[in-house]
């Protein structure tokens, strides 16, 4: 096997060398607990403050509105559970979508079963977009929160955050967005988009694992999620992960500075890959919108094959990809996202997600496409499905 070509950057990314270098002193040199009063802790306190500011700058927030967590899933749980508990006297209705990450969907299910919440799960169209008119119709006097992801982790669709936030605020409803995939990939301004809460995670932007944040707009009365000490202004207890915060702050700053140039390159390579796959492999459809999608996301459904078989054979060539989100790739169930956009089970099972990084070249993509073509031909020749033009449905 030659070099590895890593095309699963929606699952996680390689921590940038400069990020690792910045983190190291806070393991062995500046290791003081930031909650203590002696001078040795001053470096830790300063590092946390800097990381908080670096992240706030990316989304146009105030540094005191950034609360560090252990990752995107915790941030999503906090946003939904704590908001529900804080505002349940006003109402018990939450609006979200059928294509959210499981950190949102499973939290909503918990709130329904255990806390008496009523949740509306909005349908999406064939490209994964919500209907803003349907959102308006779903609002009731009991609605306290709208949670819609900024960018879908599987098909890359970019939801109309500004319009959603405007609708929410017109009705006096809080707006939360899961921006785990979008943060550092597309410009987001919390004031411009009327966002009250935003979740993100460090390891999606060449930062470390185990660190995330929840942006909470000043004035939002969200309750503490982890009880104990007085860290994070008494809203999230636990000794701060100083190395993680340092790394996350630098990764956020790095992603923001390189965003325009980096994403332009990713879009060029992404579109080249999409065009080759769609024109050179029959019975393939692109999942998600062709334009309003994450710069690095390619997701296709290939008829007459099983996606898991394709992944295993790609792995033999050193190509790392996914058939869906990493959180569900071990499951034989088809992606809930692909089912929500209208794909039947057999086509959802043939999905392939390829997510780029700044290190991926056009030559890498051309090599990958050639391997996909050869593997698809081989799998189709062995398929028990009738591979003829008469048997193929329109994708």
Regions found by a protein language model. Name each.
Residues 390-395:
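A short, hydrophobic C-terminal helix/tail in secreted or cell-surface proteins
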Residues 1-389:
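Pyridoxal 5′-phosphate
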